[in-house]
């Protein structure tokens, strides 16, 4: 009888990536097949996020539902992973004694052993350590699930912004070696992936070891990824302004595979608030980066993160944020009301902004961003945009859907053989959350592919030394 696994995931794209790796790993080691129905599962895993308010209570609410399933099936294994698990550790079992496994983002690769241990003597397992980059060495080979794929290139963050729990829950920055990353991407390209999204909590801080022992920069890595045949688009998230160096901007100037869209969090337009947040940059320095980026890539569109109602934020501080939004002309944002995260310096600050004022500021900010986003979309009306076709439209199975370089969803009429390929689409209609278009050119008319296949890239780039150890050969 097939054993089944159910994973519930909250939070960032890194968590989504981690959950996919858990599924692949437990399929490879135990033959677990994913199910969307928790009641069918032999193992339930909750991959948590601690960024937002009441994250812990959300976890225990979900666990309460799963407790009922365990009462019906005592052999059911329940595991809690992610950032709340890393933050709370053994405290989770104090409130939910029926949880069998507690693991952190850096120990998910040990899940097979943890499950075996629980199956053996029913003793609970708690492992929330930070074993450097070990987890990537233990994960199975990547498996493509469409024309786009996420690839984690580094973990953790050293910035210690006063409001953020990431350094405490995912550890400090650790970068994967460049040859490991490139080999994974080449494998994905061989399976039909056309676009990769490089992931990291502070992705542009990547400083990975090269095959010859030297240390590569993020700009170096972007150029190497762009050289892999079959990879026609590169995205990355999330970056930090303090690490956004001129050599990265030069890649935007020289490398068409890097898309004309960037998510670069700023959080506030007030230098005083930025200082309280521990951001280590000013609003002017942020705008200087954007100015240089647009000089290198005039059509680039920028999204960002904002926190409103940070302790001590005055009306004047908020107005400076609104001015920055207008000056940069952001295309979209992830914006939130400040909520203190336990264990962070900001949790000890006086939360002196009234709740109603926070809500009003958030509404004003989001309305302005929405207006700017619609203005950007209207400029695209009548233009021809290159779309990577990801599948059928959510609105109609009779239509296809894909994304532009600047991350706009476009729905259009097409044929199934277009899925996984590029098409050029003329934009005919603009809506708040999507665009509509008609196909004017198929990939066969573009000449994108080169004669060399992704398989030959793997063969060319993966060499072995005298001991049989693989390394990357550019």
From Swiss-Prot:
The Radical SAM core domain, residue ranges: 143-375
Protein keywords: 4Fe-4S, Cytoplasm, Iron, Iron-sulfur, Metal-binding, S-adenosyl-L-methionine, Transferase, tRNA processing
Ligand binding ([4Fe-4S] cluster 2): 157, 161, 164
UniProt KW Transcription regulation keyword: no
Gene3D superfamilies noted in UniProt: Methylthiotransferase, N-terminal domain (3.40.50.12160), tm_1862 like domain (3.80.30.20)
Entry note: cofactor: Binds 2 [4Fe-4S] clusters. One cluster is coordinated with 3 cysteines and an exchangeable S-adenosyl-L-methionine.
Disulfide pairings: none
Top-level division of the source organism's lineage: Bacteria
Residues the entry annotates as binding [4Fe-4S] cluster 1: 12, 49, 83
Keyword Repressor set for record: no
Main subcellular localisation: cytoplasm
EC number(s) on file: 2.8.4.3
Record domain MTTase N-terminal: where: 3-120
Enzyme class: transferase
Residue stretches spanning the membrane: none
Cofactor(s) recorded in Swiss-Prot or TrEMBL: [4Fe-4S] cluster
Gene Ontology molecular function: 4 iron, 4 sulfur cluster binding; metal ion binding; N6-isopentenyladenosine methylthiotransferase activity
Domain TRAM residue range list: 378-441
The family this protein is said to belong to: Belongs to the methylthiotransferase family. MiaB subfamily.
Function noted in UniProt: Catalyzes the methylthiolation of N6-(dimethylallyl)adenosine (i(6)A), leading to the formation of 2-methylthio-N6-(dimethylallyl)adenosine (ms(2)i(6)A) at position 37 in tRNAs that read codons beginning with uridine.
Subunit structure: Monomer.
Cross-referenced PANTHER family: CDK5 REGULATORY SUBUNIT-ASSOCIATED PROTEIN 1 (PTHR43020), MITOCHONDRIAL TRNA METHYLTHIOTRANSFERASE CDK5RAP1 (PTHR43020:SF2)
Protein known as: tRNA-2-methylthio-N(6)-dimethylallyladenosine synthase
Taxonomic source organism: Escherichia coli O81 (strain ED1a)
